[in-house]
Design a protein with these regions (language model features):
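Active-site-proximal cap/loop segments of hydrolase catalytic domains
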Residues: 1-133
Length: 133
């Protein structure tokens, strides 16, 4: 299969080594900037447990991480309300990390299933916006 030849075949030792080398967990010590992770709890490609692993590894290293989880999403955010809320989080997150302005969240979280297990403090206005939701 083309996919396995490009990213690694977990059924072979060579493939396992390739997957390990490409895994963010292998390189967590090299992450030096805040990270935003958006995850669908029902993602069949990137399991929630994998996102949980990188979040935990970053927390152990005291690397700032914001973890946004959507319990009703899979790979990619299909529900418009969830997409809108993630765009709002991303805009504020990037504003804090890179500088510049962002549109304060208004109704961006209405109807969204967004949860933020960790890192809410790295996104300006997120705590307040979710409290109004």
């Amino acid at each position: 299969m083309l996919f396995r030849s490009r990213v690694g075949d977990p059924r072979t030792e060579v493939g396992k080594a390739l997957l390990k080398e490409r895994s963010p967990l292998t390189h967590v010590d090299r992450i030096s900037r805040p990270l935003l992770i958006g995850q669908g709890a029902n993602d069949p490609r990137v399991k929630q447990a994998e996102a949980d692993q990188i979040v935990t590894a970053m927390q152990k290293k005291n690397i700032p991480v914001t973890y946004v989880l959507y319990p009703d999403e899979g790979h990619g955010f299909a529900r418009p309300a969830n997409r809108t809320s993630f765009y709002a989080v991303t805009e504020a997150f990037l504003s804090r990390c890179l500088g510049g302005r962002f549109e304060p969240p208004g109704k961006d979280f209405d109807g969204a299933s967004i949860t933020v297990p960790t890192g809410m403090e790295h996104v300006p206005g997120l705590k307040e916006a979710l409290a109004r939701k």
